[in-house]
Amino acid sequence: MNAKEANFDGLVGPTHNYAGLSFGNVASLSNEKSDANPKAAAKQGLRKMKQLADLGFAQGVLPPQERPSLRLLRELGFSGKDADVIAKAARQAPELLAAASSASAMWTANAATVSPSADTGDARVHFTPANLCSKLHRAIEHESTRRTLAAIFADEARFAVHDALPGTPALGDEGAANHTRFCAEYGAPGVEFFVYGRAEYRRGPEPTRFPARQTFEASRAVAHRHGLREEATIYAQQRPDVIDAGVFHNDVIAVGNRDTLFCHEHAFVDPQAVYDALAASLGALGAQLNVIEVPDRAVSVADAVGSYLFNSQLLAREDGTQMLVVPQECRENANVAAYLDALVAGNGPIRDVRVFDLRESMKNGGGPACLRLRVVLNDAERAAVKPNVWIGDALFASLDAWIDKHYRDRLSPVDLADPALLDESRTALDELTQILGLGSLYDFQR
């Protein structure tokens, strides 16, 4: 059946700020306590969505979550009226207010793991929201993520939206940032590729400086839950030393699409065995794997982390070639820029590179790939998606005006104590649910 890959980007929320909450994320820590521009952040992401939609790619949008999370703050013992809760948290535990105010749900690569209907046991598209249990500010996302996905992909005959895995370190799950899918055609059965940082119950190498957020056990549980065929499911371990170098998700060191894997030579433990396993599984489906392995002598791991070369989108064009969507930091790094020029000049599958300004997201450690959740849909499934979430001229104009109306152009960590920010955010989100036709999505609307 005819199918295409759709990208659902997270719309940056009104509380976008730099609180330095993500240990292991070099950009997040290095920009801690600097001023953010929520309006610019949201517009940068929206313009990427619109330009890709204009190029003919299926592009959807996912709304921000309600922040600050009064639910979290109340669960942590802060009481009183909403303004009192925020004031007490700001005075007694500003780090908890920062966690409750994070706009990190914008990085929808961590929202869920998605398996298309061609791969699953019941021929439905399966979504498992990521529990993100390694970080407090992200561990509060999964219930709202489930609610949002269930509203957009509401047809239970075609879509299965699961709860997150139990939030224990043994089942630490970071979603699609550690998952990709290889296939000959999107509508044909494919090979699903899960990358983990450590195993809870198997002895093996682990990072020593930064935590490994994804476990083998979580990846395997998602595969079982989605009913994936064992012979078409491959697991690989990310190299611990690159996690310690700031590669906190696999999508900072590798990206794949269709029959192509684009990765750094130090991405995986025993990389040749990984390539061989993928090639064998894909070969059994009648497709040939293309591996573009970037040598460390051309682009170091430090260059990859600094530029986010691999946190790019690899998109299939109608002529069968692929296009790489990268942040502008790739052009500002001489080694990476030279590599990209040589890559496009070659005769490989990647023939075009598009550069985007995503500076506000990048300063928190999120590039083009972080901002999108890939969902392969056939024609009938796409028709069943809530229609108002697809980016086109009208929705772009509505969202652009909505951002202008509701977003601040400067936000520092101390501004999170402003009770007006909660009111501004709720007013904005209430209007957004009407624009997107999603009903009463948020706690404050219920």
UniProtKB/Swiss-Prot annotation:
- Give the residues the record marks as binding substrate: 19-28, 110, 137-138, 213, 251, 364
* Signal peptide region: none
Pathway in which the depicted protein is active:
Amino-acid degradation; L-arginine degradation via AST pathway; L-glutamate and succinate from L-arginine: step 2/5
Note one Pfam family from the annotation: AstB
Entry keyword Hydrolase: yes
What are the alphabetically sorted keywords of the record?
Answer: Arginine metabolism, Hydrolase
Name the chemical reaction catalysed here.
Answer: N(2)-succinyl-L-arginine + 2 H2O + 2 H(+) = N(2)-succinyl-L-ornithine + 2 NH4(+) + CO2
Q: Does the keyword Electron transport apply?
A: no
Tell me the disulfide pairings in this chain. none
List the GO biological process terms: arginine catabolic process to glutamate; arginine catabolic process to succinate
Q: Where is the active site?
A: 174, 249, 370 (nucleophile)
Q: What is its EC number?
A: 3.5.3.23
Top-rank lineage group of the source organism: Bacteria
Q: Which InterPro entries match?
A: AstB_sf, SuccinylArg_d-Hdrlase_AstB
Molecular function GO terms recorded: N-succinylarginine dihydrolase activity
Matching entries from PANTHER family are given as: N-SUCCINYLARGININE DIHYDROLASE
Q: How does it assemble?
A: Homodimer.
What NCBIfam families does the entry give?
Answer: arg_catab_astB, PRK13281.1
Q: Which HAMAP family match?
A: AstB (MF_01172)
Q: What does this protein do?
A: Catalyzes the hydrolysis of N(2)-succinylarginine into N(2)-succinylornithine, ammonia and CO(2).
The similarity annotation says: Belongs to the succinylarginine dihydrolase family.
The protein here is known as: N-succinylarginine dihydrolase
Whose protein is this, by species?
Burkholderia pseudomallei (strain 668)
